[in-house]
Amino acid sequence: MLSRKAVAALLLVHVTAMLASQTEGFVPIFTYSELRRTQEREQNKRLRKSLRVQQRSKAAGRLEPQEVMEEEENGVIKLTAPVEIGVGLSSRQLEKHRAVLEALLSEALPPPSLVFGGQRPVTAAWE
């Protein structure tokens, strides 16, 4: 038969396994030093932001913090890479929507006489 030590060891392993299956363990993702570093970075960001607000208020008269926040939220997004915007149409789609496209372009663009001094430019491939 099994010795007392073997039975006690098996019983201990079984009890430990049962307790482990019943409990929900928490393993921290970040260490204390990483959390502290993250908090310091956030605090530095806030300090830099408040410093920028103070500099702006000195340069452009007194601005309220709400006005500065609204100004930053409504800011223009500046692109750092070239962006190509275009529309591709097949010949069937072009024939179907030609009148609408010509109307939109005539509203959006000035007449050719104003742009090219009376000369008629080649404006599209379908002409």
UniProtKB/Swiss-Prot annotation:
Query: What's one GO MF term for it?
Result: hormone activity
Which keywords, in A-to-Z order, does the entry hold?
Cleavage on pair of basic residues, Hormone, Secreted, Signal
Let me know which tissues express this protein, per UniProt: Present in the gut mucosa with the exception of the gastric corpus. Also present in medulla oblongata, nucleus of the solitary tract, hypophysis, spinal cord, hypothalamus, and cerebellum but not in the cerebral cortex.
Q: Which terms in the GO cellular component ontology are assigned?
A: extracellular region
Chain spans, region Disordered = 41-67
Where is it localised? Secreted
Keyword flag Signal? yes
Q: Does the keyword Signal apply?
A: yes
Signal peptide range equals: 1-25
What superkingdom heads the lineage? Eukaryota
Which family would the database say this protein is a member of?
Answer: Belongs to the motilin family.
Summarizing the function annotation, the protein's role is: Plays an important role in the regulation of interdigestive gastrointestinal motility and indirectly causes rhythmic contraction of duodenal and colonic smooth muscle.
Entry protein name? Promotilin
Ranked from the top, the taxonomy reads:
Eukaryota, Metazoa, Chordata, Craniata, Vertebrata
Protein's gene: MLN
